[in-house]
Amino acid sequence: MSVNLLKETGPREVFCGLTSIVWLHRRMPDAFFLVVGSRTCAHLIQSAAGVMIFAEPRFGTAILSERDLAGLADAQDELDRVARELLERRPEIRTLFLVGSCPSEVIKLDLARAAERLNDELRGRVQVVNYSGSGIETTFTQGEDGALSALVPLLPSTDQRQLLMVGTLADAVEDRLTHLFGRIGIDSVCSLPPRKSTELPAVGPGTTVLLTQPYLTTTARLLRDRGARVLTAPFPLGAEGSRSWMEAAAKDFQINADQVASVLDPLVARAQSALAPHREILNGKRIFLLPESQLELPLARFLQRECGMELVEVGTPYLNREQMAEELALLPEGTSVMEGQHVENQLDRVRATQPDLVVCGMGLANPLEAEGIATKWSIELVFSPIHGIDQAGELAELFSRPLRRRELIRQALNPPSSALIDSDPVHA
């Protein structure tokens, strides 16, 4: 391993895992996510999702009051009452996620016991599961890891030979990848999370798992415990990473390399054409990735190898060396990879190095923009359909756009001076 692995601890600037509800509730329309938390939790999710509460979205918050926090009320009884009222009002709900938060964890509210009690009462009409979306020890993408980990014990068992893609993808991207795997020769492909929470994929010794996201560490471990084989491969961001990701599955299924190349070569050629205009803007530019989403290593690999950017520093909240081994191997020798965060120290390094672009959280973006440093919100990368060979151009555009916008603003503020074309003197 030729990269320079570093680690630091200190104050952090990240969203909590409740944010992942925004994409999970869209993925599984028959599920409901009930956060047990404070008004701050409710405001966060509603703002992040951009949904008015009167629209009756598939998430909500059971707000812990001062009496709950002080131990003057039985929070378990109140939670049961709220859950019953919710399920009575929304009979279409098939899976209810009880989601822990910082306040519920502080008062040691046992959501696992609540889920078990509700399951006994509902007798299979609704499946109730629980996980933690607290941000005390985790970053925002790990909320999905918690949700999927809660589903793994519910997956049926199978010995069938199949490929399981794990991690939320846009429906169109998932359909495209499934189609491409079929053309390669892998016909049995399923996904976790499924599009319906009641149609869980089966898992067993014949299951090969491809992670679509790098932050699903716990889910991967639980799937291994169920007998599945979890592949280690570059993640499907950019043409190169997506190709290697699909080739890893093809190799595991013992599919002829020429067959794989016949399907993927034209797609890669088209992706390189789509990348070309963005590479013109990004080539040679310096980028600093602050830790937030755990997508930073695959993004750094894509931006350096396919877009020609120079990596100043690559931060990541947590680093699973085994799971990220393929990504680390593709980074340039000497690349600084910083695990963890001391936000003040990292901002000092940003100011000292003056990169052309910084990938960071929304809370840091505006202050850095005010200092003249271009930024890209890391959360936008989670909400955008960026996976797969076909999406390489769109992924590059997310990074070229802020630089192009900054150049247009610079030109507008500093128009070229118009030379006088008449040689005659100008009279008042």
Swiss-Prot record:
GO terms for biological process: light-independent chlorophyll biosynthetic process; photosynthesis, dark reaction. Belongs to the BchN/ChlN family. HAMAP family: ChlN_BchN. Binds 1 [4Fe-4S] cluster per heterodimer. The cluster is bound at the heterodimer interface by residues from both subunits. It is an enzyme of class 1 (oxidoreductase). Pathway: Porphyrin-containing compound metabolism; chlorophyll biosynthesis (light-independent). Its cofactor is [4Fe-4S] cluster. Keywords: 4Fe-4S, ATP-binding, Chlorophyll biosynthesis, Iron, Iron-sulfur, Metal-binding, Nucleotide-binding, Oxidoreductase, Photosynthesis. It comes from the Bacteria. The lineage of its organism: Bacteria, Bacillati, Cyanobacteriota, Cyanophyceae, Synechococcales. InterPro entries: LIPOR_BchN/ChlN, Nase/OxRdtase_comp1, Protochl_reductN. [4Fe-4S] cluster binds at residues 16, 41, 102. Component of the dark-operative protochlorophyllide reductase (DPOR) that uses Mg-ATP and reduced ferredoxin to reduce ring D of protochlorophyllide (Pchlide) to form chlorophyllide a (Chlide). This reaction is light-independent. The NB-protein (ChlN-ChlB) is the catalytic component of the complex. This is Light-independent protochlorophyllide reductase subunit N. It catalyses: chlorophyllide a + oxidized 2[4Fe-4S]-[ferredoxin] + 2 ADP + 2 phosphate = protochlorophyllide a + reduced 2[4Fe-4S]-[ferredoxin] + 2 ATP + 2 H2O. The keyword Methyltransferase does not apply. Its EC number is 1.3.7.7. The gene is chlN. Gene3D superfamilies: Nitrogenase molybdenum iron protein domain. SUPFAM superfamilies: Helical backbone' metal receptor (SSF53807). Protochlorophyllide reductase is composed of three subunits; ChlL, ChlN and ChlB. Forms a heterotetramer of two ChlB and two ChlN subunits. GO terms for molecular function: 4 iron, 4 sulfur cluster binding; ATP binding; metal ion binding; oxidoreductase activity, acting on iron-sulfur proteins as donors; oxidoreductase activity, acting on the CH-CH group of donors, iron-sulfur protein as acceptor.
